[in-house]
Amino acid sequence: MDKINIRNFAIIAHIDHGKSTLADRLIEECNGLEKREMKDQVLDSMDIERERGITIKAQTVRLMYTAKDGKVYYLNLMDTPGHVDFSYEVSRSLAACEGSLLVVDSTQGVEAQTLANVYKAIDSNHEIIPVLNKIDLASSDPDKVKSQIEEIIGIDASESLLVSAKSGIGIKDVLEAIVSRLPAPSGNFDNPLKAILVDTWYDTYLGIVILLRVVDGVIKKGMKIVMMSSNAVYQVDNIGIFTPHKKIVDQLSVGEIGFITASIKELSDCKIGDTITEEQRRCDNPMPGFRTIHPVVFCSIFPNEAGDFERLREALKKLQLNDASFTFDIEVSNALGYGFRCGFLGMLHLEVIQERLEREFNLDLTATAPGVVYQIISKNGILREVHNPHDFGDVQDIASIKEPWICATIMVPDQYLGVVMSLCNNKRGEKVDLSYSGNTALLKYRLPLSEVVFDFYDRIKSISKGYASLDWEMDGYMDSEIAKLTILINSEPVDALACIVHKSKVEQRGREICLRLKDLIPRQQYKIAIQAAVGSKIIARETISPYRKDVTAKLYGGDVTRRMKLLEKQKKGKKRLRAIGNVNVPHNAFIQALKIID
């Protein structure tokens, strides 16, 4: 295939601005699917994506388009996620393309994730075509949005395309702009094979599948290839593309995006961003690869059935193959047994992984409180990174504790600016900058990550009636007053409920968890004491009263000492029961107790 007729492009936008709907219309216009096969969000293959109306995994599809100049062009479309938790998926997709369609909702304008994604595209040297979507709505204001694009982002918006992805207006113009304004891929057909590994996933029938972009040379069926980071050698079994159906082809050459299978058994050989080359004729230098991504939110996941531990381990391995940003290690809990300490890019990422484990692998799970990575410096100068409360150590040995901070970009209509700033201040935030574009405020704040990951996104959306948008990036570590909060039930610490909290909020958090547990733990035959402690100091307590059997019911008058004797006997029995019995704590109590409302 002549690379002159190839166009590789990504669709980038803020969440809910219509990326997946635009992808549907492009597929429909290019006859990628028959009318009877078309459905909304056709590239969103997971049920969870359809139900939530979001894209989680970047998807690729090759389309054939006959342009006005009479030539047939091959368009490789990458539909990318819009939520901040999946920004790593966006970065990978952009590395495989030369251009981007920047989709902006013409009723909403530029939002925070629009900025983040377009800057990623600029860093990738992309040609960018602004596309203003939803122009058929009465509240659409294309001129205002063009001004915003030029003022806030700093790119020319004079030739922005006006479309309605839902009704199909302007789709032909988008396709013509792709072939006329976006560059063809560079690279040399005669050079040794050089391909970048963009994504991997597990297929029940094919095993490990690799999505790649050929930069130089050609890859053919039967060729022996090398993973340059590990020097692992494999023979290519199958080569294919998505149209969006899987279609087997003989080869992929310069500029093409497709998938291969090669009977790969070792997950460690498939590193996202690795360079693939031919064993007999290796390329000189590997590609730069992708920026290593590190999880920022951690929580423990336990199977509710002890026998499901191995099933959970296998499920996590398969999900990790499909999502390199997700990590896990074995953990043992006194309360919940064997499980895994898992790392995520944010709370939505955590929810999606847990939901996929439960749906796709039919597992019943309990997740503990999410937390972030703290740096603990001991008195002898040793630095430890801790994300698990169990590893906090003795307070007497700690010289200082640092917590991660972020730089948040918040875009909000000016009428909601006051409540948003108030929320940021309540979350221990520090204002960095405030600017305006029309009646939209662009707010920059530094905030502790621990205050952001749990419910900050939902709270911002709620107080701004859905109009505010948020993006953030890591901004280093700062000294902080941090304490480990321990929850005790009948004087026994419950490790699954331990959490690391800022000292200014430790009493409030302790009281709230105790109150929640009081509502969630059923009454027993003996009194249950629920306590929150920092070190040896009890900071909150709630008591669950026992059931009381009326042991004196059979008495009718007579000596009062008989009554006292029966009550004393009941008291001794309950004391013995309390000493030998375990408190029955329902599994859902753990996660419910930690869903604290500010």
Swiss-Prot record:
Q: Which family does it belong to?
A: Belongs to the TRAFAC class translation factor GTPase superfamily. Classic translation factor GTPase family. LepA subfamily.
**Function statement:** Required for accurate and efficient protein synthesis under certain stress conditions. May act as a fidelity factor of the translation reaction, by catalyzing a one-codon backward translocation of tRNAs on improperly translocated ribosomes. Back-translocation proceeds from a post-translocation (POST) complex to a pre-translocation (PRE) complex, thus giving elongation factor G a second chance to translocate the tRNAs correctly. Binds to ribosomes in a GTP-dependent manner.
Q: Which domain of life is it from?
A: Bacteria
InterPro entries, per database record: EF-4, EFG_II, EFG_III/V, EFG_V-like, EFTu-like_2, G_TR_CS, LepA_C_sf, LepA_CTD
Q: How does it sit in the membrane?
A: Peripheral membrane protein
Q: Which PANTHER family match?
A: TRANSLATION FACTOR GUF1 HOMOLOG, CHLOROPLASTIC, TRANSLATION FACTOR GUF1-RELATED
**Which Pfam families does the protein's record reference?**
EFG_C, EFG_III, GTP_EFTU, GTP_EFTU_D2, LepA_C
| Enzyme class at the top of the EC tree | hydrolase
Cite the entry's keywords alphabetically: Cell inner membrane, Cell membrane, GTP-binding, Hydrolase, Membrane, Nucleotide-binding, Protein biosynthesis
Entry annotated with the keyword Protein biosynthesis? yes
Q: Taking the first listed entry, what is the main subcellular location of this protein, grouped into a coarse class? A: membrane
Cross-referenced CDD domains, in alphabetical order? EF4_II, EF4_III, LepA, lepA_C
- Kindly list the positions annotated as binding GTP: 16-21, 133-136
Sample GO molecular function, one term: guanosine tetraphosphate binding
Q: In Gene Ontology terms, what is a biological process of this protein?
A: positive regulation of translation
Q: Where in the cell is it found?
A: Cell inner membrane
Q: Which reaction does it catalyse?
A: GTP + H2O = GDP + phosphate + H(+)
Give the tr-type G domain ranges.
Answer: 4-186
NCBIfam families assigned: lepA, small_GTP
The name this protein goes by in its record: Elongation factor 4
* This enzyme's EC code(s): 3.6.5.n1
